[in-house]
C-alpha cells in the first residue's frame, strides 16, 4: 500500500517542519506546492528527507494571497497525485499537525472497499493569556474534516473561490464516507480571540455573503456563536461563566437532548438562505427530547410529519421541532415540568440521523439558544473528543428549512 501526503505552503516556515514530520510517520511520499514563499519554506522543503516532489511558483510574481485560486491549487495537487497513483491520499494545510493513536497504515489496509474517504477531528490550539479558558467555557474548538481518500483517476476539485473540502468533489461517486477514530488534526492558527476576529474580518472582505462558507456566517462559526458586533457580549459572558455567575436553572432543568451522541448541524443566526432562529441538533433516532424549563404547552403545530411544541413560561417561549416517534402526544394546556420527556426523535427520511430544532423567543424576538443554555451552566456542544458526523458527510447538513426575520 502506498500513501501520498500533500500540502500547499505560503510562508509556512513557522509550522511547516512539524507538519512534514507528522506526515512522514506514515506516508511514502510527500508532495508540496510552494506558492512564492519568501521565508525559509524553500529551505525546509529542500532539506526534509520525506519530501519527494515540490512545485514552486516564481517568487517575482505579484504578492497576492495565493497565485492561483484555491480550486485551481487543489486541481494541481490532484494532478500531481496522478503521477504517484497512490492507494490513499492525505491532504493537510501547512499549519496542521497529524496526531495518531493508531497504526494508520494498518487501519487503512483493512478499511472496507466501499469506504472511499475518511473524516477525523480537527482541534484548534488555544493559547490566549487574556482568555485562557475561552475553550471550553464558550464552546468547542473541534470540527470534523476530510483529509483522507482513495486515489482514483479523474478526481476533480470543487469550484468555489475558497473553503472547498480537501477531498475531491466527486469522491462519493466511488463509495461512501467513513469516520476515522484515533487520528486528530491539530490546527496551529486562530489560537487567540484576537486572531479569530482578524480571520472573520478577512473572510468577510472576501466573501461578505458567506456564499463560499456553505452559507454559514463567518462570525457565528469562529466566534463561538456570537456575531462580530457581539464581541463585548462574548467577553462579558465569558467573565460571568468563569465566576460561576449563571442564570437560574430550575430543579430538573437539563439540555434538550443528551450530550452524547449529539452534534450541532446548523447554528443560530444568518445563513445564505435566511435567518435561522434556532439551533439544530443531530442525534440518533429514538433519542429522548426533554424540556429545558417548565411551562405550559401553548402551541402545537404539525407540518410534513414534524411536530412543533411551544412551551411558554412567563415571557419566554421555548420551541422544540422534531419528527416524533410513536409515543403519545401532548395536548394544548399540558403543564410540563423542567426535565420532563416531551417525546423521542424519529428518523429523518433516508438519513441515519434524527434532528431537533431548538428555539428560544422573548417579547423582543429570538435569542441565541446556545447562549441561553450555556448561561444556565448547560453546555450544548459535544464534549472533547466525542465529535459526531452529521448526515455522514462534510460539511454537516440538516434538512431544516425554518427561517425568520432577522432579530
From Swiss-Prot:
Give an example GO molecular function.
Answer: metalloendopeptidase activity
Gene Ontology, cellular component aspect: peptidoglycan-based cell wall; plasma membrane
Q: Which UniProt keywords apply?
A: Signal
Q: Which Pfam families match?
A: Glyco_tranf_2_4, Peptidase_M23
Q: Which Gene3D superfamilies match?
A: Glucose Permease (Domain IIA), Spore Coat Polysaccharide Biosynthesis Protein SpsA, Chain A
Query: Transmembrane stretches, by residue range?
Result: none
- InterPro entries for the chain: Cell_wall_metabolism_enzyme, Dup_hybrid_motif, Nucleotide-diphossugar_trans, Peptidase_M23
Q: Which residues form the signal peptide?
A: 1-27
| Superkingdom in the source lineage | Bacteria
Per its record, how is this protein called by name? Uncharacterized protein Rv3786c
Q: Which organism is it from?
A: Mycobacterium tuberculosis (strain ATCC 25618 / H37Rv)
